[in-house]
Amino acid sequence: MINKKRLINTFKTLVQIDSISLKEGQMMAYLIKELKKLGYKPYFTAKPEGGEVGNLMVDVPGQGPVVMLNAHVDTVGHSRKIKPVEKNGYIVSGSNTILGSDNKAGVAAILEILKTIKEKRLAHPAMQIVFTVAEEIGLVGARVIPKNKLKAKFGIALDGGDINEIVNQAPSQINLKAVIIGKAAHAGIHPEDGINAIQTASEAIAKMKLGRIDKETTANIGIIKGGRARNIIPDKVSLEGEARSHNPKKLARQIKHMARSIEEKCKAKNAKCKIKTQKIYTSFEVKENHSLIQAAKGALKSTGIKPMIKSTGGGSDANIFNAIGIPTIIMGVGADHVHTAKERLPINDFVKGTEIVLELLKILTPVYAMFPPPLHFQWRGGSRIVLPCAPSPSKMEKGRRA
């Protein structure tokens, strides 16, 4: 039903517009132009500190409670212009850099869905489109959206890979930053007068439990900086790390363990330390029996794909939306090997993933929901009930005559 060629061309256009985090102005200008062509009135919300623009939102009138479609428009940094090329059924980068399918694929899918709905005059739910900025640097854009600007009852974040997956769980994350202060000295003449901050940091890290802690928890030290010259005992080192967990008690315990490892080693070495921790986002779980997940499963099945409910170890805008009370799932559009020069977008999956989301919107439309396979949704007293099947037209007709 969607226009495959147009979808692919839109994606290729998007990835050639640079939009690294906090520098998404050109991308938003393009989206505003495209949305206005469709007759919509896009508007900005508050922008994050240091950003060129804020998040872009569009209200799409429709039937029933508001459904949010979300995709972030920023990418990780890259040193070369992205040149998309088609090769063996994939879109890849022809310039030895990232492709930008994370998350230009999601953005392109939303644009194509809006265009298809307009062209074919399809029934659809009321929607709020939310294009966020600065997702790649800690969900910064989504975090500054005023809660009263978000009108959706539930949401769909297009920010995944495999198109058969419905992501309904993600962890909390706490970041850790530490500065270790030692004492400088000449490394060849008076090394005993110094306190080696790098050595202290190394021994502290060696004490930490890192990597996969258990099935719910991970931890990492990802950045270490320090030292001025090879012949000077380093007097200052900075560390940056993180811990993630689906379990809040485990997360608190892990980040405390990492901080204590630094403190204890600094005490043993007569060094000083300053440690800061910051919660970046909160874990979420949308229960598998939630009507949104049931609808997503129905959309996948109706397009011939076996759905898989999945937990992820990464964070996304969905964490922010769930935290403020909007049940939001993550659905994939095919992105593969993201954030690397090997990144690629399988064309068939990209097209199919977009069609699945369009099918999901049909299922979420009250008028369409009267006659779908395989699920029927009915409103009673302000809540949604999932029924095993729709009433037959003949029975409905008899009911009307009665």
Language model features: what each stretch is:
Residues 20-65:
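A non-catalytic alpha/beta surface segment that caps or lines the substrate-entry region
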Residues 28, 64-126, 131, 136, ...:
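Active-site metal-coordination/substrate-binding segment of hydrolases
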